[in-house]
Amino acid sequence: MAKVWSKRFDNTLNPFIEKFNASISFDKKLILEDLECSIAHAKMLGKTKVLSSSETLLIINGLEKIKVEYLEDKFSPSLPSEDIHYCIEEKLISLIGETGKKLHTGRSRNDQVGTDLRLWLRKEIDNLEILITDLQKSFLNLAKSNIHTLIPGYTHMQRAQPLSLAHHLLAYLEMFQRDRERFQEVRSRVNISPLGAAALAGTKIKIDRNFTAEELGFDKIYKNSIDAVSDRDFCIEFVSASALAMSHLSKISEEIILWVTDEFSFAKLTDKCATGSSLMPQKKNPDVPELIRGKTGRVYGNLQALLTMVKGVPLAYNKDFQEDKEPIFDTAETISSSIKAMTILITEGIEFNIKNLSESVQNDFSNATDLADYLVCKQVPFRTAYHVVGEIVKYCLEREILFKDLKISEIKKFHPEFDEDVFVDLEPFNVVKSRTSEGGTGFTQVEKEVNNWQKKLLL
């Protein structure tokens, strides 16, 4: 099959180079977007009288027929077509004859592929908006049922202060909200039309770029034709936003992996979201969070690939840009499937061990700050109180006891302001309850945030 550019050359491509050069194996994913783009372009050529009304109708009907054949598995793009764009053009010419050769008037594959990729990515971002919202709802529902469940809070992976489990889960809603907002911002820059920029300099053909932009649902057009065909910022921004979202999914995955270990025993996985071992019959493996954690590296790699691809590439379009699609496609699939898997895991795959969680906050010094705050509330300077409590912790460690094991006479030796009610303040439930500052882990604050999120997510 002759290439669209073959008349310039005397010899045919080396078969290996032909395959190496082709993108049809992966850019065929853009077939529906390419058809959508071409239909809008044909309508515009008809509107500006570049095509007659009969030619316009013939081309549009031909493109619609190709779409039907593709959806019915009667048309499968493949080699020797170089890419999806010329594959469709060849198919159109075979269906309607010479008129099909007029479709490419006033455009280049450079602006065409940029348009196709933006249309495809826009749909993916809109789908991610739905998926992330569902993920947030799953976390919120789990939080609602665990407002008064206590869990150790950690810094440096060392016990720090007790928390409401709901408060811990709500932290992820905040992260996912930032992810949603980032994708929305990326969408605003995806939704700009390069169509009509042609190869790099625009065209002398009478076209209406604003018409095609409106037909395809773009917010506006690129104002510089060189920038229009060479811009891949939107690809990098999408993968960057995805990388951050994956980092958040990886973070909760790591926590779940820890929580379900025998050493922590804070939770267990249900049979719906766990697998076993081919050798060890007792095993129940957290494959879902492990896979999400592992897949995060793929997205990071895709981001590095795209950043390297555009580094040092001169204006305008270069063949390097053919390498933008596979990282984009892989990232979109990875982030979407990971979000879906995490939503299922949170909804029906994890059960918290309330008894172990409750016991875990009873047997440590994570209430030490509250012991200091007790003195602060009695007008003792914080740093003085801090040092006093440090001495008490050391005293207890040397004797292998906890604060609750101390007698009032013992604790008074460290500071006279201590009284019997100090032990009430040190109860983990009361410790958490007392954190009433806005955004804190106190139950009233957590309930307030749960209500706020219910309104935000329309639950």
Curated annotation (Swiss-Prot):
Pathway: Amino-acid biosynthesis; L-arginine biosynthesis; L-arginine from L-ornithine and carbamoyl phosphate: step 3/3. Its EC number is 4.3.2.1. GO terms for cellular component: cytosol. GO terms for molecular function: argininosuccinate lyase activity. It holds the Pfam family Lyase_1. It is found in: Cytoplasm. GO terms for biological process: arginine biosynthetic process via ornithine; L-arginine biosynthetic process. Keywords: Amino-acid biosynthesis, Arginine biosynthesis, Cytoplasm, Lyase. InterPro entries: Arg_succ_lyase_C, Argininosuccinate_lyase, Fumarase/histidase_N, Fumarate_lyase_CS, Fumarate_lyase_fam, Fumarate_lyase_N, L-Aspartase-like. It catalyses: 2-(N(omega)-L-arginino)succinate = fumarate + L-arginine. Gene3D superfamilies: Fumarase/aspartase (C-terminal domain), Fumarase/aspartase (Central domain), Fumarase/aspartase (N-terminal domain). SUPFAM superfamilies: L-aspartase-like. Its main location: cytoplasm. Belongs to the lyase 1 family. Argininosuccinate lyase subfamily. This is Argininosuccinate lyase. It comes from Prochlorococcus marinus (strain MIT 9312).
